[in-house]
Amino acid sequence: MSFEVLEQLESKIQTAVDTITLLQMEVEELKEDKVKLEAEANELRSQREDLEQKAQQAQQEHAQWQERIRALLGKMDEVE
């Protein structure tokens, strides 16, 4: 092979190595982003579950108050 062909081959190999290195760096960044996003998703799930529990508790309290009011209104009707 001629010297020029070897130089071209070396250049192409170096370009490939550089590209692979950049892609590896990008993969690492994406892995880090994935970990962060998974942690954020877990936190959001936890917050959603807390809110759902609070909403359910509020609904139960609301139903209890409605029942108490109905009972009081029933007693008032009995008095009248």
Swiss-Prot record:
InterPro entries: Cell_div_ZapB (IPR009252). It is found in: Cytoplasm. Keywords: Cell cycle, Cell division, Coiled coil, Cytoplasm, Septation. It comes from the Bacteria. One of its GO terms (biological process) is division septum assembly. One of its GO terms (cellular component) is cytoplasm. The keyword Coiled coil applies. The keyword Cell division applies. Pfam families: ZapB. Residues 3-80 form a coiled coil. Signal peptide: none annotated. Homodimer. The ends of the coiled-coil dimer bind to each other, forming polymers. Interacts with FtsZ. Non-essential, abundant cell division factor that is required for proper Z-ring formation. It is recruited early to the divisome by direct interaction with FtsZ, stimulating Z-ring assembly and thereby promoting cell division earlier in the cell cycle. Its recruitment to the Z-ring requires functional FtsA or ZipA. Belongs to the ZapB family. This is Cell division protein ZapB. The lineage of its organism: Bacteria, Pseudomonadati, Pseudomonadota, Gammaproteobacteria, Vibrionales.
